[in-house]
Structure formats: structure tokens, C-alpha cells
Amino acid sequence: CIRDRYCVHGPRVHEFLQEMNREVLSRYDVMTVGETSGVTIEEAQKYAGEDRNELNMVFQFEHVEGQGSDHGKWTTEKYDFQEFKKVMIKWQEELAGKAWNSLFLGNHDQPRSVSRFGNDSDEYREISAKMLATCIHMMQGTPYVYQGEELGMTNCPFNTLDNFRDLESINAFHELTEQGKMTEEDMMAAIGYKGRDNARTPM
């Protein structure tokens, strides 16, 4: 992919990261993490390899980007637990003793983790939040807790398009409904489930 070759994983990116580490970062007591969307295990081992002197850890997205539909990320299907488990185990095993990983389930671009990976009903919200936190904190890597995650925050019940502020959701709604690829009802459900506004509501 041209994006990966020239923007994300450019031909001299490792050379430049090593120079930055050598000339600047190594002189201070700092920790570095690289947001590496689309990174492979092999690339992650280069970016955060213990003997590479580039970054301390990678922030990879395979476990949260893996599920989609014919319309990109816009779906209301629950995440496939077996696939999620397979991806998490792969990263744990392949980076063990070689590189360091960031552990997360949510951020400003993802729906709330309890709504996505757990059960956000009144009966199971708290148990789901605790189970997900235990999962993340018991693995090898550095856990990241996104604001509100420690409270078990769930997706917000947006019920009209006017409630949304994120242009990604608004534009996708218009594009997919006007092209007849999704009904307005299905699209409202999809952006309500996967939209970024869910993670941007006040705590």
C-alpha cells in the first residue's frame, strides 16, 4: 500500500527513529510509544525491539480494527470473541521477549469498550467492565486506561443524527444512505454502535 510505504512505514523511518533516540531521547528519563496503525508483528519488533533503540513500545490496532463489514467499520455485529482472542494471543506470544506492546481496548477513536466487547446492560455493565480490565491488566505490556473506562462508561444513546458531532459518522451516514447501501435506521444503529462520538462524551 502506498500509504504504508511512504507515510506510515517509510523507507528510512527506522534510521530516523534510531537517530532521534540517540541524539535526544536517550539523554532523558522518558518513555516513548509509537502509534503504529497497520503494523505487522515483524514491524513492531523493529519499532520496539529491545535491542533496536527506537521506541519503548508500539500502539497497534489489529484487535480493534479487525471487525468490519462491506461498508467499512459500519456494522452493529458484536465482535467475534474467538477472533479477538486469537489476535490478542498472537501479539502476546510474538512480542514476548522481543518487543513491548501497549494494551488497550478504547481510545478517542473507538466506541466504549464495555459496549463493544462486553455487555452494557444494567445487569452486566459492571461485571463486563471488571472482566475487560482484568484481561488487559493481566497480560504482558503496558495497559492504557482511556478516560471513563475506569468507571465502566458505555456508549451514549444517540437517537438522532443531530446528536452526532463527528464528521466521520455524519458523512458516512449521508454517503451510505444516499447510495442506498444502508437504510437510515440501520445506519443510525451502526454509527450509534461504532461512532467515535461515544468516546468523546463528558465523563
Where are these regions (language model features)?
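Active-site and adjacent substrate-binding regions of carbohydrate-active enzymes
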Residues: 3-203
